[in-house]
Amino acid sequence: MGLAKLLTRVKKNFGTTILPDGQINFNLWAPDAKEIALCIKKPNESFLELKMETEKDGWFSIKTDKAKIGSEYMFKIDNGLMIPDPASRQQAKDVHNASIVVDSNEFNWENDINWKGRPWHEAVLYEIHTGTFTKEGTFNSIKEKLDYFVSLGITAIELMPVADFPGKRNWGYDGVLLFAPDNTYGTPEELKDLIKTAHEKGLMVFLDVVYNHFGPEGNYLYVSAKSKFFESKHITPWGDAINFENRYVRDFFIQNVLFWLEEYHFDGLRLDAVHAIKDDSPVHILEEIVAKAREQIKDRNIHLVLENDDNISKFLKKENNNHDYYEAQWNDDFHHCVHSLITGEKTGYYQDYSEEITSKNPAYFLAKCLAEGFAYQGEPSAYRSNVPRGENSKNLTVSS
C-alpha cells in the first residue's frame, strides 16, 4: 500500500467522542476480548454497566446519554477485569483507576488561534522535567518561570514526557496512557494554559513522546490487545516490540501525534529512541507520522525531532529536497565523544570514541560531528560488535 492511500483511508478514532446531540461515543479496540462492558461511575461509587456493540477487527463501541462530560468510566473485559481507557484523555486518580470524559473544545484558546509558531532556525531549546523543575512540580508553576526563559534568550521549552505513568514520580519514560497528561503535574486545561501563555511570550513548546515501548506497570493493552499490539519478532531493551505492522496500532500513534499538535497546540514533538521502533512495513511508521502531520497541519510551523542512535539520515531534511522530513535529531555522537574527551570513559557505547579502542582521539570524532553531523556514517562500531553504524550525513542541512 502506498503512502497516498495510507493517508486517505477511513479509520476509527480511539477513545471518546462527544456527539452533536450530547451523547458520548466510546470506542475500544480490544481484539483479545470477546465481550466488553462500558462501566460508568455513579455518585454512590458503584458502576452502571452497558454492554458494548461488537464490531469487526476487534472493535467495540457504544453511544449513550448515560455519560456526560466529566463522567468517570472504565471498561470491563469479558465480565472480569476493569481497565481504564487506553486512549484516556484524563485519569481520575492513577493509571489503574477510572478515566474521565473530557470535552476537547472546552478550553478557550483566545488569540492562540493566530499563533503561527517560529521557524526551526530560531529554536533555542530548554529541556524541562515538569516534576523537578520547580518545587511544586506542576504545569502551573512552570508558567510562572516563562519570563525567566525569555530573559535567557530561550525560544522554546521542551517538556520531558508527561503521558500518565504509575505513581507520582517518574522521568516520564514509563508512560502507559499516552493521551492523558499525568495528573500529578496538573489537568489538561492547566497544560493548555501553560502552552497558551508561553505562546503569548513568543515561546514555542515541544513535547517529548515515547513510541518505542510502554511502561511495565499499568499497561492494560496487554489485557485487551496483546496479540495484535505487540510482537516478539523484535525485542527492545524494554520488552516486546510494538507491532507497527498492524494498521490499528499505527493509527493509535498517528492519532496521538495529531492529538498533541492539534488539541494542545504543541509546536513540535521529540520522538524518543526511534532506533527501538521496529517496523518492516513497506512504509515505515516514522515516514507516515511525518507525512500525516505535514498534511494535516499547514497553517503554522510544526517541528518534529528524532532521537536516533542508529544515525539514519534518510528521515532528515536534505539540501534541495522538499519531501516530508523531520527537522533534526539529537546527535548522540556529539554527546558521547565530548563525554569521552572530558572523562576518558571507555565503557559501553563510549568505547566507540576511545583512542585505545579506535586508534582515534575523541577530538577526531568531535571535529567530524562539527563538520559533517554524524561521527559514525557507516563505520564499524566496536560497541555493536563491529557492525556498521550510521549513514552519510554530509548532505543534511546545517540545522538538522
Model-derived features with residue positions:
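Generic secondary-structure boundary/loop-capping signal
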Residues: 11, 49, 97-98, 104-106, ...
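Short proline/glycine-enriched turn/loop motifs at strand-loop junctions of beta-rich domains
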Residues: 29-35, 68
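Core domains of carbohydrate- and sulfate-ester-processing enzymes
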Residues: 77-113, 201, 219-226, 231-233, ...
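Substrate-binding/active-site clefts of carbohydrate-active enzymes
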Residues: 92, 113-120, 129-298, 303, ...
